[in-house]
Amino acid sequence: MELDRRNLLRGGLVAGGGAALGLLSSGTAGAAARTAPAFVRSGRARVTHGVQAGDVTAREAVVWTRSDRPARMLVEVSRRPDFRGADRFRGPVLTPDTDLTGKTFLRGLPAGEELHYRVVLADLDRHGVTSAPVVGRLRTAPRKRADVSFVWSGDLAGQGWGINPELGGYRIFDAMAAVNPDFFLCSGDLVYSDGPMTPTVALPDGRTWRNLVTPEKTKVAETLAEYRGQFRYNLEDTAFRAFNARVPMLYQWDDHEVLNNWYPGEVIDRPGYTEKRVDVLAARARRAMFEYTPTTVRAQVGGRIFRKVSYGPLLDVFMLDMRTYKNPNTTDTEKSGPGLLGAEQVAWLKRELRASKATWKIIANDLPLGLVVPDGTEGKPNLEGVAQGDNGKPLGREREFADILGYAKKHRVRNMVWLTADVHYTAAHYYDPAKAAFSDFDPFWEFVSGPLNAGAFGPNALDGTFGATLKFQQAPPHANTSPAEGFQFFGQVAIDAASETLTVTLRDLDGKALYTKPLTPVR
C-alpha cells in the first residue's frame, strides 16, 4: 500500500477502559470478532473488547480498542487481508486514566478503498512483546462519484432488555452487516445508563427473557466507573463486536447515555440516584462516551459532538448534538429564548449546509422533528423533543428549526434528508409546506428507525407545524414490547452513483424490507 510515509507515525492521543472480555484472534474481521474470549500467553497484553473504526472520510479514520493492562496501541493498515507490505501507525499508551481504552488516528489513507487494519498492543517494558492481533476493515470515502450505502438506528439495551444469549444476543447487527454498508450511523442511546437489568424477565406469553448481567448493570450509572461499565456491557455481545470490526461508525449521543430526558442544569429527584445534579452525571457520561466510541472528537479539549462528515461527492452527514445545549423541558410554548441546538450550533449548521457541495445532505437528528415526545419525568405535561403538538405557528423549540428550514430554502440548499431514532418504532414522514402552519421551506423527508435491542413503543402523534404527513409506520401492539416479540428496526440508505437517486429502506430485526422510498435529487 502506497501511503504517504511522512504521515505514518502520526498516531492518536486518546485513551479509555473497562471489563475484560478476551482475545479476539486474527483472521477475517468477522471471524476475529466472533472468536470466543481467551487469554493470550502469560505476560502479554490482550485486547478485551474488540476493535472499532469511526468517522471515516476519504483520507482519515480513527481506530479504537481496549487493553487489559497498560500498553502501546499500534495499528497496521493494508489493502491486502494478509497485511503484506502494511503500514504502521503508532498510537497512544493505554492507561487506567482512560480505562485502558484508546484511539489511533489514521491519516494519509487512499480514497475510495476497502482497507484492512489490525491492532496489536505492545509491552511498555519488553521490546517486541505484543498481544495477538485483532483485525477489522473499513472503506474510505470516494473522491469521485461512487455508490454509497449505510445503515442507521439507535437504542441498545433499553428498558431492561439486554444481551440474551438464548436468542442470539444483539442479532440485529447480523442483519445490518448482511446488507454490507459502508458505515453505521448510530442515532444515540448506544447505552442505557439509567436502565438496570435483572437476570430474568417474565414475558407476557409465559416465556422467560434471560439477560447477561454485569455489576455495572445492576443499578443506575452515577460514577465514572459505572458509566464506563455501560459501554463495556454492550461490547460483551458477539454480534455487536463482529459488526464493529466490519462496519465503521458515525456516532452521536441521545439522552440515555446520561439518563432519560435530561437537560443541562437539571436537578433530579429520581429513584436510585444519590447524585442529583445532572451536570455532574453528564460530565462523567460524556467522558465515558468519548473513551468508548470511535469518534474523532477529543474530550480533553471539550470537543464538540456536532460535526460534518463528508463521504464523497454524493454525501455529507451533519451530526447534530441535541443534548449539550438543550433548554429545560417545559410545555414548549415560548415565543423567545433558547432551544435545543444553541446559537453556535445553529450558525454552524447553516454555514455548513450552504457550503456543502454534496448532492445529498443527511441531517442526523437524535430527536425527531415532527413527532410529539412527552416528558413525564417531573409529573408535568412537559415535552422532550422539537414538536409541541398544537399544529400551529412555530413556538418553543420549533422556532430554531423554522429558522434553519427557512434559511435552507432562501439559499437553495437542496436534498436534505433527516434521519432519527429515539421513539422505538419505524416510520416515514413527508414534510409538505402546502399542509404546514409554517410553510417557508422546501419539502423534505424524515425517516425514523429503531430500536436496536430495547423495548418497542409508539406510535407518537405527528405535529402539523411543518406539515408532517405519515407515509409509513410499524409499531408494536403494546408498550415495551420485548425484542423476543420483534419490532426492532434499522434503516438503510443507498445512493446510486449513476442516477444519484437516494433510496431509503426501513428493515426489521431480520433485515426484511418493510418500506422503500427512492428519492430523486432536486437540481
Report the location of each language-model feature.
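Metal-dependent phosphoester/phosphodiester hydrolase catalytic core
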Residues: 2-23, 32-523
